[in-house]
From Swiss-Prot:
Gene3D superfamilies found in the cross-reference section: 1.10.8.60, ClpX chaperone, C4-type zinc finger domain (6.20.220.10), P-loop containing nucleotide triphosphate hydrolases (3.40.50.300)
Function, in words: ATP-dependent specificity component of the Clp protease. It directs the protease to specific substrates. Can perform chaperone functions in the absence of ClpP.
Gene label: clpX
InterPro entries: AAA+_ATPase, ATP-dep_Clp_protease_ClpX, ATPase_AAA_core, Clp_ATPase_C, Clp_protease_ATP-bd_su_ClpX, ClpX_bact, P-loop_NTPase, Znf_CppX_C4
Protein name: ATP-dependent Clp protease ATP-binding subunit ClpX
Organism: Desulforapulum autotrophicum (strain ATCC 43914 / DSM 3382 / VKM B-1955 / HRM2) (Desulfobacterium autotrophicum)
Length: 418
């Protein structure tokens, strides 16, 4: 009901309760009034909701070029330019193919190009796939190939990968069928000739065979509530032919396979002799051929479903320092934001950043290991800081990283005295 003060003959806003003297305008309706302030507030709320609802559609409808896709990857992933170019072109062609199939019904069928990423731990393989999925606003699922087994053995069925994607799409099947799946550690399911357990291959070549169909494109039957299949259960049908599969692995020792092939071809008089130490692993991986991956242990049928192959280089100390500071969600920026909640400025010296990068190289953990090193460095600081009053800046130096010594704290009192 509209409030009206009979004695003063004043009208009140039906929403906020302010009278006509407290606002600029009071608009009358059928037995109700609304003030100009509430109208402005309603406009802001509607505008914000429209932006949120339209943003995903605009992102998915916009025709992004490979260059624009790479520009987005550049803001989150340091270096690895060739891998980012390969991914950008592959993703661009993949979704262009899906759009073309909707608009055209001619006889030309363009097959999808799944991707194989080869590189050491912590070089950015998983992050590249995650960033693509987030930016393109498509569902994303991450799977570990080492947990997969053939049907009939204890372990994860390969179709559970599709189930994870459907769950991440909130069971929107149409949306899930345009998603991205990243399968990590595919090098661990390789079948090598010298494998002592070749007679019982539970999670090696058998898993490669099981992955063939869903990667190439098939109709997978997914239990709606997860878990193992039951005969009485109603299955959800998911078409995988439009799902982009990105596989990744470290492939430790692959460079030796490549080197052996190159050495055999370069034997004889006049051949250039180069020691193994002089040969860079990254340079060897650039000379990768499908036959090398087959000798490593991937079966030809599985490799044939991954036509786009690219390698990522190992990150050196300079690259790791950039990863700490430059990306949009850089680790240092995350901790600085945490310290801002305490009204404290967090500063790392160049020596401290270099020490963290050097430790990550020593551990051979790449960018993934930087968070663990940062946590170790910051544990005592973050434990003591909330109990310490009037701190305005925390300066972390090299000794804090290497010897876990206390950081330099600057207090508000020192600022006032100065």
């Amino acid at each position: 009901m509209t409030r009206k003060d009979d004695e003063s003959d004043q009208f009140f806003c039906s929403f906020c309760g302010k009278n006509q003297k407290e606002v600029k305008k009071l608009i009358a309706g059928p037995s109700v009034y609304i003030c100009n302030e509430c109208v402005s507030l309603c406009e802001e709320i509607i505008e914000d909701e429209d932006k949120e609802s339209l943003a995903p559609a605009e992102a998915s409808d916009k025709k992004l070029t490979p260059r624009e896709i790479k520009d987005v990857l550049d803001t989150y992933v340091i270096e690895q330019d060739r891998a980012k170019k390969v991914l950008s072109v592959a993703v661009y062609n993949h979704y262009k193919r899906l759009d073309a199939e909707v608009k055209s019904e001619d006889d030309v069928e363009i097959q999808k190009s799944n991707i194989l990423l080869i590189g050491p731990t912590g070089c950015g393989k998983t992050l590249l796939a995650q960033t693509l999925a987030r930016f393109l606003d498509v569902p994303f699922a991450l799977a570990d190939a080492t947990t997969l087994t053939e049907a009939g053995y204890v372990g994860e069925d390969v179709e559970n990968i599709i189930l994870s994607l459907v769950q991440n799409a909130d069971y929107d099947i149409e949306k899930a069928q345009r998603g991205i799946i990243y399968i990590d550690e595919v090098d661990k399911i390789s079948q090598r000739g010298d494998n002592p357990s070749i007679t019982r291959d539970v999670s090696g070549e058998g898993v490669q065979q099981a992955l063939l169909k869903i990667i190439e494109g098939t109709t997978a039957s997914i239990p709606p509530k997860g878990g193992r299949k039951h005969p009485q259960q109603d299955f959800v049908k998911v078409e995988t032919s439009n799902i982009l599969f990105v596989c990744g692995g470290t492939f430790t020792g692959l460079e030796k396979v490549i080197e052996r092939r190159i050495s055999q071809k370069s034997m004889g008089f006049g051949a250039e002799v180069q020691s193994r130490k002089e040969k860079n692993v990254g340079e060897l991986l650039e000379q990768l051929k499908p036959e090398d991956l087959i000798k490593f242990g991937l079966i030809p049928e599985f490799l044939g479903r991954l036509p786009v192959v690219t390698s990522l280089s190992e990150l050196n100390e300079a690259s790791l320092v950039k990863i700490l500071t430059e990306p949009k969600n850089a680790l240092l920026k995350q901790y600085q934001r945490l310290f801002e909640f305490e009204n404290v400025k967090l500063t790392f010296t160049e020596e401290a950043l270099a020490a963290m990068a050097k430790e990550a190289v020593t551990r051979r953990s790449g960018a993934r290991g930087l968070r663990a090193i940062m946590e170790e460095t910051m544990l005592d600081i973050m434990y003591e800081l909330p109990s310490t009053e009037n701190v305005r800046e925390c300066i972390v130096g090299e000794e804090v990283v290497l010897k876990h010594e206390p950081p330099i704290l600057l207090f508000e009192q020192a600022k006032k005295q100065a």
